[in-house]
Every structure is written in structure tokens, then in C-alpha cells.
Amino acid sequence: MIDLEMAKLRQIKRANTDWWINSRAVVGENGKTYIGYVTDTGEIHVKEMDAKCERAVSRDVCLRRLNNDYADEHNAPGICVLRSGHIIAAYTGHGRGQTYLYYRITEKPYDIMTFGPEQTQEYEGGTTYAQIYENCVQNEVWLFCRVAKVNWQFRYSKDGGKTWSAPKNFLHSEDGGLFYFDIRKQHLQGNNGRNEQFFFAVYGHPRISEDHTIRSGIFASNGQVLKTDGTPTDMNLYHDDGKMLILSELDTVYESPEGTTVRLLDVAPTLPLRVAFAPFVIDDAFSPDPAKPTYYSATFKDGKWVPSQPICTAGEFLAKGVIDGSQTYLGGMAYYYGVGEAGLRRYSEDPNHDPETYTNRIYIARFDGKDRVLESYLSTDRGASYRLEQVIRRIPGEKNIKIWRPIVPLYAQDNLPVYWHEGTYTAHSGGWHCDVKMYVEYDD
């Protein structure tokens, strides 16, 4: 819970990101928080903050000006802070159909003022949604992005991002499918303490796609594709054999009933495996009913996905009347990634063994019928149900300032557990104006 009396409200002006960029913010081993964002004039930035010491100087660097000519949030940077301290920022040129992914690497550890020259990767189609992580088991950097709207491709680097493998197509959807892919790096307990896996969920566009099912799987650190229970499939990210993800081999998190659809909202970065989503009905493709979307969290238990009880209603769509598909976006959900109540200890099925240790927290942005709010919800029954913990931010509805996209930085702690966006929302159609907001509880 955030101590609102002690915490200080901080902001990054004119800052935005996208729902499908990863990682958007990372806490480095130096304790600093690094946030990637795009401005409403199309600039690509990385912000460095110290959430521990209020007297520490924050820094901000612009990596590219007028990227793609206008404020397309698809092009926001994904950032990766390597164990070496070097930082990689990757971003795209979505709106103009550019076939390049751009990236820059710091020349000095933890020093955003030393980003080297911009480098490029070329693809066979327009790019968007850069998702970048370090695979510490293989000593590699993994990079995912969507290409030509219907393909997801993977590259890896063995030298900290200096050179890259050829792209591997691992997910394809037919025209109109527009599949979305959301992946999180997870640390596992192992004898050497370095085991990792990459947990993902995929689904189709809520309005355009004909497939309204959320599915899940895992990439092991050796590239092997696993079902959610750990059962290997015959696909490996490293193998140049033409094999791709077979949707029928993945586990179904949520299958929309006839006449309904769903939004994938978050994928948990810690055990137990959890996926956040909101099903709803679109009575008219361009006038979705804001009373119907409801937030849920599904937990993987006993070899299957089990949805929670309804958590709360979303209350509104962010861009009603926009005809590019973004009218079906909601305020959003984010799983907490930190210490204590985040549930970093091994998940236990024993209901009598210290149940409070395994609580998990979700941050939710929504319209409560009167005001736009950012709230936290807690589960103490292993994700079966959630209760309201705290109203973190409240904006009167008549101000027409929306709250959306809560984000928990990778490796976040209680000093800065979450940040969110406030302003006007029109997604990638341009014309949005928003700021990043956060409460920070400094140690000194």
C-alpha cells in the first residue's frame, strides 16, 4: 500500500508508451529506475530516476527527434538494462510502414548520457512493438517485434546488442488477425539460482480479428517452447526449421463466448502464472457499451487456467468513437512486481501454510461512474478473488482527464511501485496529450 501522506507526486511531462512495448521501465542493479517513453511530438526518450533518495539528480535523454513524423505510441521504446549496466533502447517507425527497427546502446554502464549512435535492423515489412529482455542463462539479448501487421519475429544477440541473428518468424496470423503478443521474463528457483523462463500470452484484435481467445505458453531459456504446465512442444526459437507457434498447442486462458470479445491487459512477471483480461460485448463496432467490460485475473492452477471472481467494472472505453480499433481500449491492469506481498516466494498450494505470504496485488485504472480512479486490489486466496485495497488517484469525471495504462517497472520496489498516464487518449491516431504520474516514497 502506498503511504499517500508520505509519498510525493512526481511526473514526466508529455510522456506516453504503448500497451505492447516491453520492458517499458526497469530498475537497474544500481537502484535507479529507467523509463522509456515517446512524446506527443514523436520524440523517443529515456528517463533516469532515483526513487530512494529525493536529493539525487534525475536525468533525461532524447534518443530521436520527430520519430515517424507524429506522435505514434506504437514507436515507444522498449528498454533493457543488462547485467553489465549497459542499457539498450529499441524503437520502431510504425506509422510510415518503415521496415526498420532502431536501437541504441550506452557506451558506459548505467549512463544514459552515453547512448551510442543509432543502429538499425531491417525486416520484410513494417515494424512495431519492440519487446526486449536479457536472457542471463544464455548470456544473450532477446528481441521480439511485430512485422507487417500479421507476423511476430525473434532475434537474439550474443554480444550485448552489437550484432544480431537473422529474424525468425514464430507467430503468423492471417490478414485481419492482428495478433498481439505480450511476454514477461520470470526468474525461477534453481540450483544455480539463474534459471529463467519467458511467459507469454497471445490473442487477436478485439474488433478486427475473428479469433477472440487468449492463449498462453512459455519460452524456456534454451528457446524451447513449452505449454503452460512445462510440457515441451516441438518448436524452438533457435531452430531455423520454419516451425511456428501452433495456437491449438497453447493453453486457453479465456475463450470468448459467441458475440463477445476480450482485451488482454497484463501478463504477470512473477509466479504464480497470472493473466489479466476484460471481456465485453460490442453491440456496435464503433459504439461499445462502457457498462459491460469487467476486469478479471486468471491463475494457472492444477494444469488449467482458473479465472478469478469479477474484480470490478472498467466503466468506460478510452477512445469511444475513434474508428481505428483503439476505441476498445480500457483503463488497464498491472501486476505488482516487488517484495513482500508481491509473492516472490515459491507458490504453495497448502492453504494452511502462511497464506498471507502469497497475496498478490493488481493496479487498476477505471471510471467508477463518477470519477476516474487508479486503485490497488489484493488477493489473499491465491487469485480466486480480489478486494479493493486503496484508491491511489481520483480525478473528478467532469474534468474529462482520463487515467490509463498503469505500469509496474521491472524489479520495482515499494518506493515506486507503479506509474500511470493522465490526459487525453486517442492512441496512435495522434492528438493525444498526457503525462506520466507516479507517487514516490523516498527513503531520505
Please report, for each region that a protein language model flagged, where it lies by residue:
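Extracellular, repeat-based ectodomains that mediate carbohydrate processing or recognition
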Residues: M1-D444
